């Protein structure tokens, strides 16, 4: 018998680049599945407090004006953690 995980959260992040040291998260998206059925979602922009490079705007469609009044990462992560609860995360 194969065990299938049917309760989980799928997580997606958009960032200002690929360097974990130098780049920042600019958007968090998550979708909750219960019994394999989509039941809820979470999304927020994150103010990276740095300029979003033009190439990243081309890829993501997210520009400085879209994040300038967004939450900072600590507040955004607190909201994400509340959303996640104790669910397994796939990303």
What feature does the model see in each segment?
Residues 1-91:
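Conserved non-catalytic scaffold segment of RNase H-like nuclease domains
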């Amino acid at each position: 018998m194969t065990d299938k995980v049917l309760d989980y959260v799928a997580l997606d992040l958009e960032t200002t680049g690929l360097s974990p040291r130098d780049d920042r998260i600019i958007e968090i998206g998550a979708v909750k599945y219960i019994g394999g059925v989509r039941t809820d979602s979470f999304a927020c922009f994150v103010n990276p407090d740095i300029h979003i490079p033009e190439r990243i705007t081309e890829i993501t469609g997210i520009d400085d004006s879209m994040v300038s009044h967004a939450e900072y990462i600590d507040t955004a992560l607190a909201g994400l953690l509340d959303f996640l609860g104790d669910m397994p995360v796939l990303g």
